[in-house]
């Protein structure tokens, strides 16, 4: 029996399409014949519907997954205010416990062939006074997919984030160029620069370029990703 696959999705910043790309990957994995589930361990920003607190990012992931996890497993920490998690957690009397997230991930792996774990914000977002999302990624021990929001400044953001990931002993399984600014000048040259630097310094392949889609449909974006290459990388990482 093939061991389940998993990856940790992070980004160069907040609001650069990390959830959108995660949803696209979920669709891609499903098309690849895999049972794909999503974990959004920490979500900040909730709304109430029918007496249940929900999160838009988590909803988008559920819509893309062909294995939908129970909400309390998919998102063990749902915070109400849309702000920095450690600040909101302190105000709401919640402790963002990494061990709880690791346990949720372990359970999720028993229910799917591949589990996409989406982080919150960028790679180093505080969860407590002493731990951040980089510590979470290390505790999970997963290959990382880096989502780069292609806009002015993205080269430095991408290289710095990649350095931070590998400095923690983690492998970058690949990166995705997500074109968030359709009016950006020299977008092709920016992507080419990031591609060359990340390949040379981190052996991190470009998994795909996602055009600025309107409407933003994850199913369409899935066709722009090299899911087969990602699956091969994840399987090799298990050995």
Curated annotation (Swiss-Prot):
Its main location: cytoplasm. The active site is at 40. InterPro entries: DTB_synth_BioD, P-loop_NTPase. GO terms for cellular component: cytosol. Its EC number is 6.3.3.3. It is an enzyme of class 6 (ligase). Pathway: Cofactor biosynthesis; biotin biosynthesis; biotin from 7,8-diaminononanoate: step 1/2. GO terms for biological process: biotin biosynthetic process. It comes from the Bacteria. It catalyses: (7R,8S)-7,8-diammoniononanoate + CO2 + ATP = (4R,5S)-dethiobiotin + ADP + phosphate + 3 H(+). Mg(2+) binds at residues 19, 57, 118. It is found in: Cytoplasm. Keywords: ATP-binding, Biotin biosynthesis, Cytoplasm, Ligase, Magnesium, Metal-binding, Nucleotide-binding. ATP binds at residues 15-20, 57, 118-121, 178-179, 211-213. The keyword Ligase applies. Its cofactor is Mg(2+). Catalyzes a mechanistically unusual reaction, the ATP-dependent insertion of CO2 between the N7 and N8 nitrogen atoms of 7,8-diaminopelargonic acid (DAPA, also called 7,8-diammoniononanoate) to form a ureido ring. Belongs to the dethiobiotin synthetase family. Homodimer. This is ATP-dependent dethiobiotin synthetase BioD.
């Amino acid at each position: 029996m093939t061991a389940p696959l998993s990856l940790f999705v992070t980004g160069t910043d907040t609001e650069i399409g990390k959830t959108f790309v995660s949803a696209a990957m979920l669709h891609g994995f499903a098309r690849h014949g895999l049972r794909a589930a999503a974990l959004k361990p920490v979500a900040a920003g909730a709304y109430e519907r029918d007496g249940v607190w929900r999160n838009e990012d988590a909803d988008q992931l559920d819509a893309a997954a062909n294995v939908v996890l129970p909400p309390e497993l998919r998102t063990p920490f749902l915070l109400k205010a849309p702000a920095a998690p450690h600040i909101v957690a302190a105000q709401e009397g919640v402790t963002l416990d990494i061990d709880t997230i690791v346990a949720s991930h372990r359970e999720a792996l028993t229910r799917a062939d591949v589990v996409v774990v989406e982080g919150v914000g960028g790679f180093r977002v505080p969860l407590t006074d002493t731990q951040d999302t980089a510590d979470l990624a290390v505790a999970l021990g997963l290959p990382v997919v880096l989502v780069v929001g292609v806009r002015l400044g993205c080269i430095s953001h991408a290289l710095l984030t990649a350095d931070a990931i590998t400095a923690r002993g983690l492998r970058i399984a690949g990166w995705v160029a997500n074109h968030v600014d359709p009016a950006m000048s020299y977008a092709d040259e920016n992507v080419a620069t990031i591609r060359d630097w990340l390949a040379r310094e981190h052996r991190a392949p470009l998994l795909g370029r996602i055009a600025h889609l309107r409407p933003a449909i994850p199913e369409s974006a899935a066709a722009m990703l090299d899911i087969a290459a990602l699956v091969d990388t994840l399987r090799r990482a298990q050995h």
